[in-house]
Amino acid sequence: MTEPTGIYIDPSSLRERLPRPYLPNNPAWETLYWRAWELGAKMVRAGTPTNSFAPQYVDAAFGGNIFQWDTCFIAAFARYSRELLPILPALDNFYGRQDADGYIAREYRWENGANLWAKGSGDSCNPPLFAWAEWLVYQIHGNAERLRQVWPQLDAYYHWLTKNRRLDNGLYWITDMGSGMDNTPRYGAAWCDYSIQQALNALTMSRIAAVLGDDAGVQTYRTEYETLKMQINTLMWDENDGMYWDLDAGDLAMKVKTVAPFWALLAEITTPAQNQKLLAHLHDPDEFWRTHPFPTLAANDRWYKTHGDYWLGAVWAPTNYMIVRGLHTIGADDFAREAVARHLDAMVAVLDSTGTIWENYRADEMAAGIPARPDFVGWSGLGPIAMVIETIIGIDLDAPNNTVTWRVPPQSVGVENLPWHGGRLDLFCSADNLRIWSPKPLTLKVIDGPHRLTLEILAGERTVERPS
């Protein structure tokens, strides 16, 4: 079987077709940004008659097999590419292989499209993030018909998980390999991340149902979400430790401190008081606030490895993105920006010394993790692309509601050619003003330090003064 090969896209074409950031105070981040797109473009694959994958789709950069949770995270930055990196066909590769009972495998073979793992194996599932990935892409293209088309697959998959991965206490189980954190030192019966991810799944499904006008679906999934939220907080939250823990078969806490509990911020299951306790762990230099944040295992855990050893302390793009999006969800925007700046600086240092972007990184020095694959975009494009647009420049697009939220940073930044209603959107800020170009009127929600503004922006170019 011929090995998969990517397509070639000329760098000048990339710059013409993709969003172009303006980061005058951090030109090295711009270099990293474009390097990520160049590597990502090489991961656009062509399916074969033997595997029946899509004619073109973006791949996980891991040897040809397609991986469920990699693909879902890749959606978070590929969505800005106007399908230059074809993310929707990549997701369709999984839906097209769904079993009649709703099951979708975590990995399918390049050679023949077959499931790599036995269906009954605990390793055969991955975090249930398809609905979340579809919702992220929907925020850019605003195409409700796409959500309508994939709803049956998403709904069937959710219910397969409830029948096959839900425990008697209402929580969910997985294995280390199935969790995506392959060698994480956890052996619980109920896993906090998998349970919280299923809550996020239910929350997102309720939002998709609302878009589709499915009132019964909204009610079903909202009830699922609230029930699971209650069980997670009742059984997994430890008030003294300020942490969610995995549970053993007797519902006793298994206290291995990983990044898994921080999914709770993104899934909106926490109270403000819980947020502060979780933030304290992220801020703690003995745990997660290292030279390069955030290691996937706390640095004061006995299993922590300074060289990373995969999920025993390495810094990984998907979990960093999850944490950063969670920080924005609870309004911790300044901390998110500081964390992303550290993440990007570390990636730049390693790019300068090695010429490429890596699968994972060490938390305590500017180096790739051991082991780690080079040229990994793949999901390592999350920092240079998605976090630059969403955290450093500060932009969240909501095309369905014709609304842009801009968390304006103190320094001058900008971006042009964001995908927006079939055209381009440009946003630039200086110390004194904001400049916007849009092909149609939009609502702009500005968060500028303590100031909150909602502006109705007309089509074309407009300049407004920053609040003081």
Q: Language-model features: where?
A:
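Short acidic alpha-helix initiation/capping motifs at coil-to-helix transition points
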Residues: 8-17, 66-68, 223, 256, ...
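Extended glycan-interaction surfaces of carbohydrate-active proteins
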Residues: 19, 23-66, 89-121, 163-190, ...
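Structural helix-adjacent loops and short alpha-helical linkers that scaffold large soluble proteins
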Residues: 19-30, 78-91, 137-155, 207-226, ...
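Alpha-helical scaffold segments in carbohydrate-active enzymes
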Residues: 35-42, 93, 153-164, 197, ...
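Aromatic-rich carbohydrate-recognition surfaces in CAZymes
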Residues: 64-170, 191-195, 199, 314-330, ...
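Short, contiguous, pocket-lining structural segments
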Residues: 186-200, 217-220, 224, 256, ...
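Non-catalytic C-terminal accessory modules of carbohydrate-active enzymes
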Residues: 283-288, 325, 329-468
